Amino acid sequence: MKHHILTLCLFSVQAIAQPKIHFDFLSHNEESSQWNGTPYYNTNRLKLISLANYFQTNGMTWNMQSDWRYLISVLTKETAALMQSTNNKSILRWMHEDKGVEMDPHAHESQYIYPDVAKLLDSIGLPESKVMGGSIYNDSNGVNVWTNLVNGQYGLVFPNYFWQPDCMMGGGTPNHVNDLKYFGFWNPQDTANYLIHDSTSHLRHIGVGCEIKIKDTISFSFIMSQVNDVVNAVQSGQYPSNGFYVQTIFFEQGDLNDTAFYNKVIAVADSVNAFVMAGVAQWSTLKQSYTEWETIYNAQVFQWECGQMSIKINETASQLITVYPVPSSGKIIFDLKSSGVQELEVYNQEGKLVLQKQVSGPGNEADLRSFPGGIYLYRLSNHEEITAEGKFILE
C-alpha cells in the first residue's frame, strides 16, 4: 500500500505532554586523500580517543560513519605499537567495543559502493551495521542509486560481498544545497516520490531533523540557537506530541585535528547535555532510537518537516489583538492592543511558515495577495512566550 503521510496532526498543546528529543552526534570522514598521510591520521586518532572518552563519561552518543579511504587507512596504519593505547584494538574496534560508538558505512560511491564499504568495516572486525550513512535521495549517488539497495546488492570492488541495509538516514542532495530536513520514519517509494510511504519497500528512512552542523565558519552561539529552536518547537507544542524526534548534530571527523574546532564540539556537547539533564531530551544512537521507535512507539509511521507547526493552535488572548477584515481578499491588518515589539508568524494549512515579521501597536499590514485562498494561522510571541494565536481566511 502506498500513501501520503498525514502531517496535519490535531492536538491541544496544553493537554498532552511533549516527547523528548533524541540527540546524537554524527560524523563523516570523506574520500579526501588527507587520510593517506600518517601524521594526519595519527593526530586525528588522538582526537578520537579524547572525544570518545569524553562522550562516554558524560553519557553522550555518537554515530561515526566512514568512507572507504579512511577505512583503508585503519586497515593499514593500525600497528601493534599504536594499538597499545586502545586496549590492543584498532581505533574503530576500541571506539565501538569499549566506548559504545556506533559504526556505520558512509559512501559517496565514486569507486566503492555501499556493500564495498560495509565489507571494509567487516574486515576491521566491526559488527554489521544495517544503516546507510547518507545518500542522494532524489538522484544517483556516484555510480549507484539507493533503490538498488532495497533488496540488497553485491559490491563492485568486492563482488562476492552482499549487503542489505534496513535503514538510511539523512536525505542528501549534491553539494547539500537542498537536503531533506525531516523528522520521523517512513519507507520511501523511489527517488521521484521519496516522501511517499511505501509499506511494500524494505528500506526505511530515518529523519535526522533540522540541519545542525558544527563548522569552523559557524559560531557556537548560532549552533546553540538552532538547538534551542528545536527544543522550543517540541516543548511548546508546535510539533505534534505523538511524534518521534531524532536530531543529529553533525561534524566532519577531520576537523577534529584543529584544537579550536575540537573545543567547539565539546562546548556544544556540554550545552546540549543541559537539555538532557533538564529532562526534555535524551542521548540516543541511531540504532537505539530506531529500536525505541519500533518497540515503544509500535513503529508508527511519522513524517514532520523542520520548522513546520501543528495545524491546530489555541485561539487565545483575543483581547490582545484584532485581525481584520476576515475573510480577506489579500491584505490583513493586525491591531495589537499591547505595547512593545512582537514577532508575527503566519502559517498555511500545511503548517508551513509563509510570513514572519516584527509588529508593534495598531495598523500592522500583511500583504498576502500572492497567497492562495484558504485558512491561515497566526501566532504572536515575545522573547518569553506566545501571546496570541488564531486563524483567518483568505478568499
Question: What is each stretch, according to the model?
Answer:
Residues 3-13:
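Sec-dependent N-terminal signal peptides
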Residues 45-51, 74-94, 115, 189-192, ...:
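Alpha-helical scaffolding within the catalytic cores
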Residues 60-144, 246-253, 278-281, 285-294:
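Metal-dependent polysaccharide deacetylase catalytic core of the NodB/CE4 family, i.e.
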Residues 122-247, 295-304:
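Active-site-adjacent pocket scaffolds in enzyme catalytic domains
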Residues 230-300:
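Substrate-binding cleft of secreted/luminal carbohydrate-active enzymes
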Residues 314-395:
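C-terminal outer-membrane/trafficking sorting elements
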